[in-house]
Amino acid sequence: MRNTRVLTGILWVLAGVYAAATYSNMLFALSIPIGAVLLVAVVFSLIHGAMRYHWSGIAAFIVICLVVSNILENTSILTGFPFGHYHYTDSLGPKLFLVPLLIGPAYFANGYLAWALSTVLVGDVRRESSAFTTFAVPFMASFLMVMWDLGFDPQASTIQRFWIWEQGGGYFGVPLTNYLGWFFTVYVFLQLFALFLRVRGAQSLTLARSYHAQAVVMYAVVGLTPVVGYLAAKTNTAVSDGAGGVWHTGSITESMATVTIFTMLFAAALAAVKLLQEPTAAVHKV
């Protein structure tokens, strides 16, 4: 792609804007809309993905991601598979069938970051990739994606009531089936993308070490969100989940921060160490 330096600069700016908007909402009680903050993350993933896979490749990622995630979310709302029994409230705005329109872009933005981090840890998937890499990258990326939801779902559902787990769950009102469903859903669309790249992807591409570092930093910025939320929390009130179980917001926010530090931030640190250890040529060749 042309103008790589310009795009690299734009990506750093987007990461900074995302961090500033997200953290300011919590620290200073601002009211920057969720959609606006999510748009920044979407643009970051879109540009970052296009630099590696070109516009056609990242477009394929988006289509696969949106179709698979919407089908499985709607299926679960209707049947309980694969996430469990839940429903969305009207807090997130208009819906596509039974799922808010904002959910698809969230899958894309965070799913791409998980994919990008996994390629740092395992290797990139391209036309000449081995079968091992083709399956290992989406498998590991699915864990990286679920790490995000571990530090997000109890806050969004039990406290903010964006969606309701109708039978509650042991993890602050969230059931284990939610995380198994997340893993399954993310693995399906990332595996389909990996197979697409194996057939239609380009040959090896030279990218700077800083390119990979941007995805690691953005993933860490997202991971810091529950930590900042915990530090900004000023109240500790009782809330109930969909089954009537009572939880305390202080316990939820502290637990989310603890979990995220030792999952997402650990994964980001591991990827950063991997980048620093790799010879320059090996990092550039993906």
Predicted regions: what they are:
Residues 1-286:
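Aromatic-rich, lipid-facing transmembrane alpha helices and their immediate juxtamembrane interface loops
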